[in-house]
Amino acid sequence: MRINMKKAEFLALLVLVIGVVCACGNTYAEEHTTEMSAETSGNIGNDSKIRESFAGESAADAQIDFDALREINSDIFAWIYIPDTAIDCPVLQSEQSDTFYEDHNAYGEEDDTGAVYIELANLTSMCDFNTVLHGKTGADEDGLFADLYRFANPEFFDDHEYVYLYLNGNVLTYEIFAAYERENTSLIRTYDFTYLSGCRQFLSDLYGTRGMAMNLRDEWENVNEYHYVITLTTQKEENAESQFVVVAVLIQDTAGTINRVVTE
């Protein structure tokens, strides 16, 4: 069961994907460009810090050229976009180390700013129960994921529901259902998301931590271990003991290819 299916059906009418779709298992179509209708795009809010786009790309103009991006860095497999924020950048996975993009930018150059990345335990096909995306806030709060903290504001949280993730040949739409601060421990190492029991435990713990400082969307309890979730995580340098996370559930898989085998 998916939450807000009427919204998902409406979004499907707005989303346009060019080319042959990709299949799960890290194999992708040869289509050069993935497009999304401009109606799903938004302008960066006044409170966000404007940063130079990576390689001139932006999902706000309704297209991502993955061929061009992979010529720059073959580790790029996706592009994340959250309307009304400065989060509009590539997502990478390094074959060298899970922490490579902690101190390297999306060009592969040494840079304390880092890049948005996933660990090797997650599939680049986005077929895991929970794909964890890491990004820095930065000392001056101008990092790639600094705007995640805006979701701590209940009004901003209520008004901004969606995360868009571009793959080569697909556009995935996620609805944000939780934003909160948690202990700074690795989700990938805390929960075994390859088993339903690990997925259930993650959701149970999320439910158990809800409180005044936690923003939750209505009907979030409908999210279960059979859904596909992304967790966006960041932290402030002066508060190394905790991390801020924004959790969203897949509500629209335009190409219809997201699937997985689940194990009890």
Q: What is each residue range found by the language model?
A:
Residues 1-2, 80:
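Accessible peptide chain termini
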Residues 2-11:
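Bacterial N-terminal signal peptides that target proteins for export
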Residues 11-17:
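Sec-dependent N-terminal signal peptides
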Residues 17-18, 228:
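Residue-level signal for mature regions of secreted extracellular proteins and peptides
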Residues 20-23:
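C-terminal motif of bacterial Sec signal peptides marking the signal peptidase cleavage site
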Residues 25-264:
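Solvent-exposed, non-transmembrane regions of membrane-associated and secreted proteins
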